[in-house]
Amino acid sequence: MNKLENLKQLLAGKFKIENFKFTHAVGDDVIEVPKEDAPALLLFLRESGQFDFLMDVCGADYPSREKRFDVVYNLFNSKDSSRLRVKAQVGEGESIGTAIPAYRGADWFEREAYDMFGIIFEGHPNLRKILTHHQFVGHPLRKDYDANNQQACTNSLPIHFNNEPGSPGDVLNDKYLPLNIGPSHTAMHGTLRVMAEMDGETIVRCNNEIGYLHRCFEKMAETHPYNQVIPYTDRLNYCSAPMNNIGYCKAVERLLGVEIPPKAQAMRVILAELSRIIDHTIAIGTGAMDLGALTSFFYMFGMREKVYGLFEKLCGARLTVSMTRIGGMAQDAPEGWFDEVLALVKEIRKGTDEMANMVIDNKIFIQRTKNVCPVSAADAIQWGYTGPMLRACGVNLDLRKAQPYYGYDALDFDVPVGTNGDIYDRYLVRFEEMRQSVRIIEQVCKNVPGGDYTIRDKGIVLPEKKDVYGNIEGLMNHFMLIIKGLRPPVGEVYDATEAANGELGFYLVSDGSANPYRLKVRPPCFAIYQSFPTVVKGAMLADAIATVASMNLIAGELDR
């Protein structure tokens, strides 16, 4: 009996399952439920131990339906690595109960669905805009909202907590000093704004605001053919851009039902692990600099620069690379490139060890990071943490092990796990992950498979230039694919990879056309940063700055 059938039997005694629809779509288990049952179902699934993680909540708009909106919950079980998608239909002007009693991390995801679609989550304690500004009119991810519509923000907001002019709610307390940090402040590591009330150097309470770098990536995806979305993914986590390319292409390929060649898989693994290394160099280097260790910053960025040199040799670009294509890679690696990678990772291993010895035993560094702003494993799961932040809390979850892809299950590497969930453990985990990435790269580079770097499906991949200019079949193939685009079958999929900051997920809906009907990104930073006010409450201001750095927040993926 499969997982879905077991779940059906379990739910039979608790719910009227004759109103539920159980399906299996592109490898995903799906339950469609009446909106009235969704909150209770989610609470039951968590409390019964079926699904401990809420990875994503999003909306989808179907204007021709009587109930035009889907509310989609993507759940994960860390014990058996199973996933479940729960869907409920909500009509215009209707509401659905909040999922916060079941999963604390639903907070910002529901606010985003409210902001983008106007879906009302009844019982949400703070249902307001999160990505668009306070003067924005409408809901941009509705199908009737024009993608070319531009709305300028001309009035600034004062420092307050409710974030909506004229709305009731918390007000500033005269006993405490109001302090605004960001969104243009070097300590914020991006366009992040923190509004705090201070009692001396202690944070009494704070609120955080995002959206300053929002450009509606998901709306742009709906207006572009599948392959043309790839450059936009570069701008998500721009510190490890190839990982975004890989995650997006992997989701589309799964919907298409194609498997890329072994050589393309190997190249993607190498690029992903190099990207993980440079992402961690930024997190460690800038974080240490915030604590006064300036040497670390220059040391780490020296390693990063050498990796960029390899990217440049492979594709001509450094930061935003667009190296992958749906079906494989954009081009093969140049001769000798894998040998250069092997030579560089030896340097990186040596440099990582030297840097770790310089930092992790440093008395000042230990005092500033150990037992500072810790997060428990239970709280991390409730918030939806993934990646190094989750593993620092003692939870051994890594998709490369839990749901292996591209041959990770055949590679020998370890998953570093912390114990205290404090700032110190977050750095220890990232240092060790750099070493493990080096191990992975060495194994793959020494055994790169032969064969092609892409599939040769004429309905998916453009022909090579020599074929376009050399024969009529290649020319016509190129013409038809450009004009009509690749067209995945009607369906939907949620696919995820282990990016540098955690689970990078793509919920993709196809209506059979050349553009995605709906593309939702699950950015790892989003779930993490929503917990910031809780994590730093009662801490010193300097510790809050160190916490921001240890979270490695990237505004590009946070705001999209």
UniProtKB/Swiss-Prot annotation:
Pfam families: Complex1_30kDa, Complex1_49kDa
Subcellular location: Cytoplasm; Cell inner membrane
Catalytic activity: a quinone + NADH + 5 H(+)(in) = a quinol + NAD(+) + 4 H(+)(out)
A single cellular component GO annotation: NADH dehydrogenase complex
Region NADH dehydrogenase I subunit C: start-end pairs: 2-157
Example GO molecular function: NADH dehydrogenase (ubiquinone) activity
Annotated EC: 7.1.1.-
Region NADH dehydrogenase I subunit D: start-end pairs: 175-560
Membrane topology, from the record: Peripheral membrane protein
PROSITE patterns, per database record: COMPLEX1_30K (PS00542)
Keywords: Cell inner membrane, Cell membrane, Cytoplasm, Membrane, Multifunctional enzyme, NAD, Quinone, Translocase, Transport, Ubiquinone
The organism's place on the tree of life at top rank: Bacteria
PANTHER family: NADH DEHYDROGENASE [UBIQUINONE] IRON-SULFUR PROTEIN 2, MITOCHONDRIAL, NADH-UBIQUINONE OXIDOREDUCTASE 49 KDA SUBUNIT
Subunit structure: NDH-1 is composed of 13 different subunits. Subunits NuoB, CD, E, F, and G constitute the peripheral sector of the complex.
Family: In the N-terminal section; belongs to the complex I 30 kDa subunit family. In the C-terminal section; belongs to the complex I 49 kDa subunit family.
Purpose: NDH-1 shuttles electrons from NADH, via FMN and iron-sulfur (Fe-S) centers, to quinones in the respiratory chain. The immediate electron acceptor for the enzyme in this species is believed to be ubiquinone. Couples the redox reaction to proton translocation (for every two electrons transferred, four hydrogen ions are translocated across the cytoplasmic membrane), and thus conserves the redox energy in a proton gradient.
The protein, known as: NADH-quinone oxidoreductase subunit C/D
Organism the protein comes from: Bdellovibrio bacteriovorus (strain ATCC 15356 / DSM 50701 / NCIMB 9529 / HD100)
Gene name per UniProt: nuoC
